[in-house]
Structure formats: C-alpha cells, structure tokens
Amino acid sequence: MQQQEQQQGGMKVKVQRFGSYLSGMIMPNIGAFIAWGIITALFIPAGWFPNEQLNTLVSPMITYLLPLLIAYTGGKMIYDHRGGVVGATAAIGVIVGSDIPMFLGAMIMGPLGGYLIKQTDKLFKDKVKQGFEMLINNFTAGIVGAALTILAFYAIGPVVLTLNKLLAAGVEVIVHANLLPVASVFVEPAKVLFLNNAINHGILSPIGIEQASQTGKSILFLVEANPGPGLGILLAYMFFGKGSSKSTAPGAAIIHFFGGIHEIYFPYILMKPALILAAIAGGASGLLTFTIFNAGLVAAASPGSIIALMAMTPRGGYFGVLAGVLVAAAVSFIVSAVILKSSKASEEDLAAATEKMQSMKGKKSQAAAALEAEQAKAEEASELSPESVNKIIFACDAGMGSSAMGASILRNKVKKAELDISVTNTAINNLPSDADIVITHKDLTDRAKAKLPNATHISVDNFLNSPKYDELIEKLKK
C-alpha cells in the first residue's frame, strides 16, 4: 500500500514537472503574446482602428517572433543561453518550412537544440587544446544549429505540420459538434492538481494562436482562463461557508476575479472535494455559452482576470465573453450553495484541508501525516536565525501568481519584525541555489525538494492564510 502511494506521488510529480516544462516555454513570453494580441485587436481590418501599415506587423510577429521566443526559452531551460541560441536556430527550419505559425514545432526544436548542444559540449569537455576554446565553442554551436535547421526543414517540419493540422481539425470538429463543454470534465480537476498553466499555455494557447491568426479569435483561450467557475465557488463560501473560509472568501474572490490568480480558490475546493462538481458545471455551462455566442479572444488572457479577458476580446465580442463568465459564475454558485448547505459535516478550516488535499492528489492521509511529522522534525532540528537566513523564496508552478501573493504577505511581516531578510518569489524550475528557506504549497513541495534539497522547506495549505508565517517570524526573531 505504501509503495503504491509512493508510486502515485511520484507519477503526480512527474506529470506536474512535464506540465510545468510545457508552460515554462510560454509563460516567460506572455508579454510578447499580449503585445501581438493588442496590435491584432486594434489594427487588423476588423479591429478598432484599422491601419493598413500597422497591420503588416501582425503576420511577421506570429510567424517568426513568437515561435522563436518559445524555441529560445525551451533551449535555455535545457542549457542556458547557449542552448537557447541553438534551439532558436533549429526552430527556424520548421518555421520557414511550413505555411502556418509553428508553435508546436518551436516547442519541439527548442529543447531538442538545447539538449544536443549540451551533449556535444560534454563530448568535447577536457579535450580542447588551450587557446582553441572559443573556436570550438562557436563552431560546435554553429554546426549543430545548421544541421538541426536543415533536418527540421526537410524531415521534422513536415511531420509537425501534419500533426498540427490534425490537432486543428480535431478541435474544429469538437467545436462545431458543440462538444467543447465536455472538456471541463478534464480541465477543472486538472486545474486543482496545479496543471492549470500547463493546460492553458502548454496545450491550448499554441493551438488557439493558430486559430486566431486565421479567424481573428479563438474560443480555446477561454477554456481555462474563465474566472466564472472559481468566482461562483468563492461567492458560495461568502454566503454559506463557516469559520475562516467564510471570512477569507471575499478577499479571495476579488483577487481571483480581478487579479486573475486562479490558484487562490483551489484550497476551497480541496476542503470540500464535492465542489469540483460545481467547477465542472460552471466551466461546462460557460463554454456552452461561449459556443452559442461564437465568443473568443484574440490572444491568451494571462492572468485569467476579467480585466485581461476584456482586453483580449475582439471588437463586437464583449457580450458573448461576459455572458459566458456570468453564466459560469451563476451555475457554479448554485451548485456550490447546494453542496455547502446540504453538507452535514462541520466546515473545515482552511488550514485543516491537508488530508483531503492528499486524497484528491493521489496520497493517503497516513502519508500526509508522515510527511508532516518529517517536516516538523526537520524544522525543529534546523536552528533558524537572522544570521543563518538571508533569502526566503516563495515558489509555485509559474512563479507569478500565488507565490507572489505569499511573498508579499511575508515580506510585510519581515519588515514589521525589522529583519534584514530578502523575500522573493519564483517558479520552482528557477529556484536559486542560494535560497535558505523555500515556501511552497504542500502539493508542490516534493518538486521543490528535488530541485533544492539543501534548503529548509516549509509547506503551506494556502499562501494567503497560513499560521506558519507567524511561526517562522517568531523563530527568526529568537
């Protein structure tokens, strides 16, 4: 039984890591995607301010700029700047060799280029004569990049192009058959498993951008980014919740709906797993509404805020987008209200959701208890003091949303305690080696430990409302 739990936990971490890697190629470049979306929404013939000259920016940006940024980032994740350069060079082969924006090809060639130049450098390590290092470094990168570019142009490009067209055709069939709402059955539970960024930016966005380049918008940008389901759940807690969940729900609703940080409502579902049904019902009804009104966005809305959604909505499409968000929120609220009111069990506090969170994510409560005991011992054994702690890092999947909120809260507490300690946030994949304390959500701690085993790791159930912040401050003040 214990071995099975460990295997399940290991599989969960692997899935999260793979998903994080996919989204990691897109997330750092979201600003460029939004820039393209703004230019598209404003200056194409059907835009707000049609401009024939500025419209010429749209095609080169989506054909060359965005795929090359993705490829560079993918290569850099494997082998820093050198890997990024070779990855971007290799990607030009699939880009030039196709007649559609080659995002999928860039997501393949970028990491492949980074990996191959990394292996090539290992092959020549300690074998280069003194004084020839720069020559060998430059030419190995050039030769590997050129070879991969030619291979991508003639062999990999056509395969990826066929795969791209099959995926696009499959999505078209699903949309026209009005089956897209069924996607919520998979998307909403996956979001609570911290795969939201992987789904949105790793899978849906690349296909959505290709659709948007042809039709001016894509409904795929609304599949994961819709804040309606989460808003409905948080509103239900405002009216029918108990204890700290009721008191914290209003603030969480504001941050979720206007700030676009969806992770903030995950603990509320994990306290009462039946609420996943509310999220699915809200998501499905929202997608059905989007489909009926032929709604879509011109580019990815990141974060999933109502403000970002409105900014990426094409001219004349506001009613459909708003209707989908409001319907999703209303349905989610009604289902959540029924579940919360009919629940006989007493409402759990936010900090008491540990065991149910583990059961939702593939681990038994015994494993959770063992993990907590192990963490408690580790924290007690390590003598934390201002002298031994210089940097505290909050880490989450993307390093932009929930971890940023947690870092802000602890930073204020550190300032009030007059401690000279840096508190920042980052993605788990980018954890710096000099971090003394790493704070993560409980379900991401295993990944953080694997990335930075020598740091002190603290797990929390909710970045916004954890008693461990005050406990940490007290330990640091001693």
Swiss-Prot record:
Membrane-related topology note: Multi-pass membrane protein
Where, in residue ranges, is this chain on the Extracellular side? 52-55, 162-170, 299-318
What residues does the PTS EIIC type-2 domain cover?
A: 18-347
The residues covered by the PTS EIIB type-2 domain are: 390-478
Q: Which InterPro entries match?
A: PTS_EIIB-like_sf (IPR036095), PTS_EIIB_2 (IPR013011), PTS_EIIB_2/3 (IPR003501), PTS_EIIB_mannitol (IPR029503), PTS_EIIC (IPR003352), PTS_EIIC_2 (IPR013014), PTS_IIC_mtl (IPR004718), Sugar_PTS (IPR050893)
GO cellular-component terms in the record? plasma membrane
Question: Which molecular function GO terms apply here?
Answer: kinase activity; protein-N(PI)-phosphohistidine-mannitol phosphotransferase system transmembrane transporter activity
Q: Name one GO biological process term.
A: phosphoenolpyruvate-dependent sugar phosphotransferase system
The subcellular localization recorded is: Cell membrane
- Residue ranges of the TM segments: 30-51, 56-76, 140-161, 171-191, 279-298, 319-340
Entry EC number(s): 2.7.1.197
Instruction: List UniProt keywords, sorted A-Z.
Output: Cell membrane, Kinase, Membrane, Phosphoprotein, Phosphotransferase system, Sugar transport, Transferase, Transmembrane, Transmembrane helix, Transport
In this protein, the active site sits at 396
Which residues are annotated with the PTM Phosphocysteine? 396
- Cytoplasmic side, ranges: 1-29, 77-139, 192-278, 341-478
**Where does the UniProt annotation place the signal sequence?**
none
Q: Superkingdom of the source?
A: Bacteria
Which reactions does this protein catalyse?
A: D-mannitol(out) + N(pros)-phospho-L-histidyl-[protein] = D-mannitol 1-phosphate(in) + L-histidyl-[protein]
| Role this protein plays | The phosphoenolpyruvate-dependent sugar phosphotransferase system (sugar PTS), a major carbohydrate active transport system, catalyzes the phosphorylation of incoming sugar substrates concomitantly with their translocation across the cell membrane. The enzyme II CmtAB PTS system is involved in D-mannitol transport.
Question: What does UniProt say about this protein's domains?
Answer: The EIIC type-2 domain forms the PTS system translocation channel and contains the specific substrate-binding site.
NCBIfam families reported for this sequence? mtlA (TIGR00851), PRK15083.1 (NF011663)
Q: What binding partners and quaternary form does the record give?
A: Homodimer.
- What is the name attached to this protein's record? PTS system mannitol-specific EIICB component
Q: Which organism is it from?
A: Bacillus subtilis (strain 168)
Q: What is the lineage of its organism?
A: Bacteria, Bacillati, Bacillota, Bacilli, Bacillales
